[in-house]
From Swiss-Prot:
Protein name: Fumarate reductase subunit C
Annotated keywords: Cell inner membrane, Cell membrane, Membrane, Transmembrane, Transmembrane helix
UniProt family annotation: Belongs to the FrdC family.
Transmembrane helix recorded as keyword: yes
Record text on subunit structure and interactions: Part of an enzyme complex containing four subunits: a flavoprotein (FrdA), an iron-sulfur protein (FrdB), and two hydrophobic anchor proteins (FrdC and FrdD).
Regions crossing the membrane: 30-50, 57-77, 109-129
Gene assigned in the entry: frdC
CC per GO annotation: fumarate reductase complex; plasma membrane
Primary localization class, coarse: membrane
Mode of membrane association: Multi-pass membrane protein
Free-text function comment from the UniProt entry: Two distinct, membrane-bound, FAD-containing enzymes are responsible for the catalysis of fumarate and succinate interconversion; fumarate reductase is used in anaerobic growth, and succinate dehydrogenase is used in aerobic growth. Anchors the catalytic components of the fumarate reductase complex to the cell inner membrane, binds quinones.
Keyword hit for Transmembrane helix: yes
Molecular function in Gene Ontology: succinate dehydrogenase activity
Length: 131
């Protein structure tokens, strides 16, 4: 059975998401995947350079010292920190932790995640620099 009624289709521009700050921030957060891809490719390139000997590794280190690569890596670091911050803020919403018959607030969980991140970072830096 068909109908002759024409359904109402609300006009939607391609930039609809730019009007609300929530959606702009959502797109920014989802966009942090692009720098993560850059870092993944760079890391794989470095592993292959390490596999192929000292000369290849020195070429990779020279590549990393390029100012454009340094800027891209700083952008990647900022994107990773933004993604980490938003992820840590979402984590308490997924966990329902009850302490003394009261639901725990998100602050201790967020602070705990940042402490774990800082400790793991310090341990990795210590192993990389002094071991």
């Amino acid at each position: 059975m068909t109908t002759k009624r024409k359904p109402y289709v609300r006009p939607m521009t391609s930039t609809w998401w730019k009007k609300l700050p929530f959606y702009r921030f959502y797109m920014l957060r989802e966009g942090t995947a692009v720098p993560a891809v850059w870092f993944s490719i760079e890391l794989i390139f470095g592993l292959f350079a390490l596999k192929h000997g000292a000369e290849s590794w020195m070429g990779f280190v020279g590549f990393l010292q390029n100012p454009v690569v340094v800027i891209l890596n700083l952008i990647t670091l900022a994107a990773a920190l933004l993604h980490t911050k938003t992820w840590f803020e979402l984590a308490p919403k997924a966990a329902n932790i009850i302490v003394k018959d009261e639901k725990m607030g998100p602050e201790p969980i967020i602070k705990g995640l940042w402490v774990v991140t800082a400790v793991v970072t310090v341990v990795i830096l210590y192993v990389a620099l002094f071991w």
